[in-house]
Regions:
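Terminal helix/beta-alpha structural elements that buttress the NAD(P)+-binding lobe
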Residues: 461-469
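Conserved N-terminal alpha-helix of the aminotransferase class I/II PLP-enzyme fold
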Residues: 47-90
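Conserved C-terminal alpha-helix-loop-beta "cap" of PLP-dependent enzymes
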Residues: 295-461
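Conserved PLP-enzyme active-site core in the AAT-like
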Residues: 7-10, 20, 80, 90-303, ...
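Short glycine-rich or small-residue beta-strand-to-loop segments that form or flank ligand, phosphate
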Residues: 57, 84-86, 164-167, 352-356
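Structural signal for conserved beta-strand scaffold positions within catalytic alpha/beta enzyme cores
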Residues: 85, 131-133, 220-221, 345, ...
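N-terminal "arm"/small-domain region of PLP-dependent enzymes with the aminotransferase-like
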Residues: 1-65, 190
Length: 470
């Protein structure tokens, strides 16, 4: 190993392993650019095309030429009034949307398992937060998005809600039919922000869930997660007319935007409009065929829509491999990694794979062979029997108020009755057990110890201590 270039050398070594990439980025380490001649040119000339704001290439912060044209094509494809390129990922889009849609002190509904950047935006904008409970699915650490009842139940508990932030779909590729809900919420005067980070490809063909960007006020889309875009490339799709939005986008984005990322975003929209329907239809046909073969092995099963409650849909271009009780998703991920198959993530009872038209056929053959060869004894984890619960503790302070105070680390035994400063998040499943500003109870301490005793990582816990407001 070249010790003078540790990161670069690690990337080179990983590339030489020739792994099958069933994780982000959506360009699958460049393979997705090989769809046509111009995509190949982009892939092979990344160094040559790394340019800045010279005269013919426009300016992302004040687009008047080719970037303006690209944004107009993007808005037309997704069916929205305005569209923006984001080079700082969806995080900058979430922050810009929150600051544009809401004012300090506004009451806003959010899913408890929303993205970290949404939490950051709520704190920075000094908003009053009302949580929507996630839906526990089975006992394996798999959660569903909130359904209609969860959403309206949360609204009824609000005093004067100004808006709502929903995730569509979640990390598992699962979504709830929220079209009518969005229309109703907008009639009530609520601003609607959709974090569609994992759904950039939605609507490309009829077998995929719908593109709901035309309905929402703001939709944030991570092109780099599923499309042939470079990491950090995302879209913000807008139907709201707030004149301050452009300022917030510039404020939360670098003044030196990467033209490589922007070019890949332009290519991703072009790819969807020209090849999306054909390629995703073919991908899903292959994925459905291979799903039957994998399920017939009797070792893992690919989660299907038929297993989910009414009203839920699942992305057929994403595999959620679920193990029987007593087997470890983390160990399955490690096993597949040893077979040069890169998963997106593991959860308590399985793994998530993000498929792509770029590598689906060869990748599926490799995946099937690895699962066929799998000795299930390698994945046994019978000692772990934790039950995943959804507890929403009493809120004593708004999250933004917490950061006006100093914190102190205290032992779990001494934390009952204290107000949490740093959120406590078991991973998996990645949903905050206690958020900033909430009160610790005996029940919560028992939940934390349950996760720790099972060997599950709990973010916000350090040597059995947590950070509370001093």
């Amino acid at each position: 190993m070249n010790k003078e270039l540790p990161l670069l050398q690690a990337l080179i070594d990983y590339h030489k392993e020739e792994n099958t990439i069933f994780s982000m980025p959506g360009n699958k380490c460049g393979l997705a650019f090989s769809r046509d001649e111009i995509g190949n040119y982009l892939r092979e000339n990344l160094g040559n095309l790394d340019i800045t704001e010279v005269d013919p290439l426009d300016n992302l912060h004040h687009p008047e030429g080719v970037i303006k044209e690209s944004k107009e094509l993007l808005a037309k494809y997704y069916g929205v009034k305005k569209a923006y390129f984001l080079v700082n990922g969806s995080s900058s889009g979430n922050l810009s949307s929150i600051f544009s849609a809401f004012n300090e002190g506004d009451e806003v509904l959010v899913e408890r398992n929303c993205h970290k950047s949404v939490y950051n935006g709520l704190i920075l904008r000094k908003l009053k937060v009302r949580y929507i409970e996630p839906v526990v699915y089975g006992g394996g650490g798999l959660f569903l998005p909130p359904d209609k009842n969860n959403i309206y139940s949360a609204i009824e508990k609000c005093d004067n809600p100004k808006g709502i932030i929903l995730t569509y779909p979640n990390y598992f590729g699962i979504s709830y039919d929220i079209e009518e809900i969005i229309e109703d919420l907008k009639k009530r005067g609520l601003k609607v922000i959709i974090d569609e980070a994992h759904g950039a490809h939605y609507g490309a063909c009829k077998s995929l869930p719908k593109n709901i960007a035309p309905l929402a006020d703001y939709t944030v889309v991570s092109a780099h997660k599923t499309l042939p875009a470079l990491t950090g490339g995302a879209y913000l799709l807008v139907n709201d007319d707030n004149e301050n939005l452009d300022f917030y986008i510039s404020a939360f984005m670098t003044t030196s935007p990467s033209y490589l990322i922007m070019a890949s975003l332009d290519y991703s929209r072009y790819y969807l409009s020209k090849y999306g329907k054909e390629d995703y239809r073919s991908l899903i046909q292959i994925a459905e065929k291979e799903k039957k073969r994998i399920n017939e092995l009797g070792k893992v099963r690919v989660l299907s829509k038929e297993e989910l409650p009414e009203g839920y849909d699942i992305d057929l271009s994403r595999y959620v491999l679920v193990l029987p009780k007593g087997y470890s998703g983390g160990k399955l991920q490690d096993y597949l990694r040893s077979k040069k198959i890169q998963c997106e993530m593991s959860f308590f009872s399985g793994v998530v794979l993000i498929l792509s038209p770029a590598n689906v056929q060869d990748g599926m053959d490799k995946l099937y062979q690895a699962l066929d060869d799998l000795d299930m004894d390698l994945l046994k984890d019978e000692e772990k029997s934790i039950e995943f619960n959804c507890i929403i503790p009493e809120k004593k302070m708004e999250a933004y108020e917490v950061f006006k105070n100093n914190g102190i680390w205290v032992n779990l035994n001494e934390a009952i009755g204290r107000i949490v400063k740093e959120a406590i998040v078991p991973y998996p499943p990645g949903i905050p057990l206690v958020s900033s500003g909430e009160k610790i109870t005996q029940e919560i301490i028992e939940e934390i110890r349950g996760y720790l005793n099972e060997g599950i990582s709990v973010l916000g816990v350090r040597d059995e201590e947590i950070l509370v407001v001093n």
